[in-house]
Curated annotation (Swiss-Prot):
InterPro entries from the UniProt entry: PRibTrfase_dom, PRTase-like, PyrR, PyrR_bifunctional
Gene3D superfamilies the record matches: 3.40.50.2020
Top enzyme class: transferase
UniProt-recorded name of the protein: Bifunctional protein PyrR
Any Gene Ontology biological process: regulation of DNA-templated transcription
Keyword set includes Disulfide bond: no
Gene label: pyrR
Function: Regulates the transcription of the pyrimidine nucleotide (pyr) operon in response to exogenous pyrimidines.
Positions occupied by motif PRPP-binding: 109-121
EC number, as in UniProt: 2.4.2.9
Alphabetic keyword roster: Glycosyltransferase, Transcription, Transcription regulation, Transferase
GO MF annotation terms: uracil phosphoribosyltransferase activity
Catalytic activity, as annotated: UMP + diphosphate = 5-phospho-alpha-D-ribose 1-diphosphate + uracil
CDD domains: PRTases_typeI
Length: 187
């Protein structure tokens, strides 16, 4: 997706304002679907898939805390060594896995990624999660679902469904990494 300040030419799908509203909406959906304010609600842990999934998880946790008054643990789950394309792509540096102090055992873990495409990153995340602990259940939240699944994966929380051609790319941009917020589609 490029390093910070790399320009991505293409058509804007979501402005910074729309990205903010979309994250807010996903946070509200998580609060409602998990019944976070109920005493029977499981502990919720948001685990972002590096790089932009970690940023999205952090923003979702902040929004959930603001709207519900409940602090939600969040962290990062590196999937590099669990990918099925390690031999066919250039080497990637390992990212940091940061599991909250309470761990993930018996928690509702929500995996968070910026774009859902083939489903292979999610499969890798499930494999990585298995090595970290045993959650009660696992859900998936994504900012953009662009279709073209190769594995039977469906997100529980989707910011925007964007039908794309396989020749197109969807680039999510966050100010923490890219200098500004937005979503761009390019060829």
């Amino acid at each position: 997706m490029g390093a910070a300040n790399d320009a991505v030419d293409g058509r804007e799908l979501m402005s910074a304002a729309v990205v903010g509203r979309t994250i807010s909406r996903i946070a509200h959906q998580i609060i409602e679907k998990t019944a976070l304010d109920s005493p029977d609600s499981p502990r919720v842990v948001l685990l972002g898939i590096p790089t932009r999934g970690v940023i999205l998880a952090s923003r979702l946790a902040a929004n959930i805390g603001e709207y519900s008054g409940i602090e939600v643990d969040h962290g990062a789950l590196d999937i590099t060594l669990y990918r099925d394309d390690l031999m066919s792509k250039p080497p990637r540096p390992l990212e940091e896995t940061e599991i909250p102090a309470g761990g993930v055992d018996d928690a509702l873990v929500i995996l968070v990624d910026d774009v859902l495409y083939s489903g292979r990153s999610v499969r890798s995340a499930l494999d990585a999660l298995r090595d970290v602990g045993r959650p009660r259940s696992v859900q998936l939240a994504v900012l953009v679902d662009r279709g073209h699944r190769e594995l039977p994966v469906r997100a529980d929380y989707v910011g925007k469904n964007v039908p794309t051609a396989r020749s197109e790319s969807v680039h999510v941009q966050f100010s923490e990494h890219d200098g500004h917020d937005g979503v761009v589609i390019s060829r």
